[in-house]
Amino acid sequence: MKYRVRDILEYTIAIVSEFASKFNLTEKQAYRYINFHKGLNFIEENYGIIHTLDFNEAVDSDAIFCRKNGGEL
């Protein structure tokens, strides 16, 4: 299924914002961390599934993915 780029971007922005709150980061720091550890790719590639999850579960899934790629949060 094809998803609109706008939907993916809006969801990604929301995930970054919630990630920042959860880990006490600025949104800029959260974006850089998630991007560096390939979490943005994870969101984009798995949008079809991840956007159906509970929002906190989606943030946790992205955090786990980032940890698997060297992140420490």
Task: Map each language-model feature to its residues.
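C-terminal alpha-helical interaction appendages
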Residues: 1-73
